[in-house]
């Protein structure tokens, strides 16, 4: 990527540098997927340089000072390099990595890494991560999906061990850091409407650039087939980290089991993702006599994933909590109608009854009803799938969604220059 450009009067100008700051960039999941979108926005624009920065998320992080590793006490916080999406990134450790809240604190090593950057764009699940780069003399934008207290409510609801109580205490501390970060950054981009309302409430006494700015979808790669054959081996698809309790995959199994017998006999349930459902799920599958009807595909590559979407009869998202639901957008981009719970992100994406269906949390009966409607009427299925594709093209296609980010960075740069 070129780092200079020539102005109309022949002056050579340095392109401003955007630091894309992401917790554990090399890991999979929703956050790196959003980071990939933001990275592409920067690269396609030709208006900025890009610097990728990965933050420590593990208590065993080798670049960090660790309380349990006396040999690390006297050395500086380290950095290491890697390649992500064909581009170099810098991984930065922290001080006291065993304590979650320490990972959200600014420190000298991180300040040195961002010193040559003009805008710091943080992409994260919960906004606490932005606190790590606040106060370093650079404008900070944070793109976030949820709050730690909301994201972890199922995990922390019934602590029964010392470790569980410890994690619950870390959540309480992180919740306060979430709020501090939202009050400190210069720009906030959220992925769902409830988080938009919360960020407005937190910032009611100050002016901040606050927007609903979800990531976009590559609608060229994720596209519908000319025709979907709903008669030959139809299946319901769910894509998720299926071991995560928040994905509530058991709800989808309950809904599937409540479908009319003739549909169960002809329509399979296909699950795909980076982690398999827990053992208890498969015990339940066996108890329901559905072993030959439920399939799990581990870690499908991109081409396989797109084909899974394109050929699905219905996409189902049974989650208890979703900051956005990128998989939902990918399915809709492929012209597949979706049934999703009102779990946060989908509430702002789907117009219920128009381009998909929304059902209440833990409502297996209504999920089964909506899925059954889409399986029983091919005409309704195709019409809703076409509307789903239109929704993505109007609001979530990556070029459309990227405009908000470019505008935010331009505004932060102009504001910074006015204060220099």
Predicted regions and their residues:
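Membrane-proximal helix-turn-helix segments that form the acceptor-binding/catalytic region
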Residues: 111, 165-188
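Aromatic "clamp/platform" in nucleotide-sugar-dependent glycosyltransferases that forms part
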Residues: 320
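Short alpha-helical donor nucleotide-sugar binding micro-motif in glycosyltransferases
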Residues: 299-300, 307-312
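Glycosyltransferase donor-sugar binding loop
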Residues: 58-59, 239, 268-282
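Conserved donor-binding/catalytic core segment of Leloir-type glycosyltransferases
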Residues: 228-247, 253-256, 270
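Short hydrophobic beta-strand element within catalytic cores of glycosyltransferases
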Residues: 337-340
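Nucleotide-activated donor-binding/catalytic signature segment of Leloir-type glycosyltransferases, i.e.
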Residues: 282-303
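Conserved acidic donor-binding segment of nucleotide-sugar-dependent glycosyltransferases
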Residues: 351-353, 357-364, 373-379
């Amino acid at each position: 990527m070129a780092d200079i450009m020539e102005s109309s009067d022949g002056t050579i100008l340095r392109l401003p540098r955007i630091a894309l700051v992401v917790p554990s960039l090399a890991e999979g999941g929703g956050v790196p997927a959003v980071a990939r979108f933001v990275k592409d926005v920067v690269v396609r624009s030709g208006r900025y340089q890009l610097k990728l920065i990965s933050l420590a998320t593990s208590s065993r992080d080798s670049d960090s000072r660790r309380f349990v590793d006396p040999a690390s006490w006297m050395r500086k916080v380290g950095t290491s390099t890697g390649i992500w999406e064909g581009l170099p990134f810098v991984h930065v450790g922290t001080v006291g990595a065993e304590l979650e809240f320490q990972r959200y604190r600014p420190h000298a090593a991180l300040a040195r890494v961002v010193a040559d950057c003009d805008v710091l764009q943080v992409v994260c699940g919960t906004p606490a991560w932005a606190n790590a780069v606040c106060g370093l003399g650079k404008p900070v934008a944070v793109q976030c999906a949820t709050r730690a207290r909301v994201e972890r409510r199922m995990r922390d609801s019934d602590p029964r061990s010392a470790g569980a109580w410890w994690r619950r205490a870390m959540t309480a501390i992180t919740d306060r850091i979430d709020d501090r970060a939202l009050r400190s950054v210069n720009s906030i981009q959220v992925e769902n409407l409830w988080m938009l309302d919360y960020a407005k409430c937190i910032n009611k006494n100050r002016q901040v650039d606050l927007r609903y700015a979800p990531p976009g979808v590559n609608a060229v790669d994720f596209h519908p087939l000319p025709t979907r054959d709903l008669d030959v081996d139809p299946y319901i698809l769910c894509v998720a980290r299926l071991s995560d309790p928040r994905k509530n995959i058991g709800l989808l199994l309950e809904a599937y089991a409540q479908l009319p017998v003739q549909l169960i006999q002809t329509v399979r349930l296909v699950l795909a993702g980076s982690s398999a459902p827990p053992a208890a799920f498969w015990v339940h599958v066996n108890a329901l006599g559905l072993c030959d009807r439920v399939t799990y595909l581990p870690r499908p590559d991109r081409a396989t994933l797109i084909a899974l979407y394109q050929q699905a009869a219905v996409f189902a998202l049974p989650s208890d909590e979703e900051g956005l639901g990128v998989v939902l957008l990918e399915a809709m981009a492929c012209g597949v109608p979706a049934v999703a719970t009102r779990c946060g992100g989908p509430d702002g994406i789907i117009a219920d009854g128009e381009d998909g269906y929304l059902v209440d949390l833990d409502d297996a009966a209504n999920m089964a009803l909506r899925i059954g409607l889409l399986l029983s009427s091919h005409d309704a299925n195709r019409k809703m799938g076409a509307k789903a594709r239109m929704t993505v093209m109007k609001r979530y296609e990556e070029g459309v969604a990227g405009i908000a980010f470019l505008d935010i960075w331009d505004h932060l740069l102009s504001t910074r220059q006015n204060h220099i």
